[in-house]
Amino acid sequence: MAFINIGFFSKTLGMEVTCDVILPQPVHPENAQDELPVLWLLHGAYGNYADWMRRTSIERYVANTGLCVVMPSAQNSDYTDMAHGGRFYTYISSELPERMRSFFPLSQRREDNYICGLSMGGAGAFKIGLSKPDHYAAIGCLSAGAQNKGGRLIRMMGSLIYGDTPCEGT
């Protein structure tokens, strides 16, 4: 298994971004797959790309599965194209998969792609997975809180992220 920390310039965000990648090492190289199945693993609020490697056993969990794991950073964006900030939904759902596939032999087939996240990342995985059902075979939401109702701080963060225009049906 290879563990790679990769940085590149995101055109969508207009800044340098970082993510961790776990690449499987084939037990029998002569039987290696041409394209790897991939898990897009999203961090929670106040976290970053390194949380999964530093605070979980993700590397042990995916050992011998042949699964690539991509763990990007999305700041505290709620995986949304912010009204007053970065376009993190577009970055995570479109640019990141394209860039990772240009670096590594990752499958584009729906049945080989999975998206999962914790807390804010779980809500982001749910949002991205449901908005792009033709891209993901499964969605994992771990402790996701998808509503933004609450106190003044929650309303202020919601306004900064989503803008002041209310959305119908929310």
PLM segments and residue spans:
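Non-catalytic cap/lid and distal C-terminal segments of serine-dependent acyl enzymes
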Residues: M1-T170
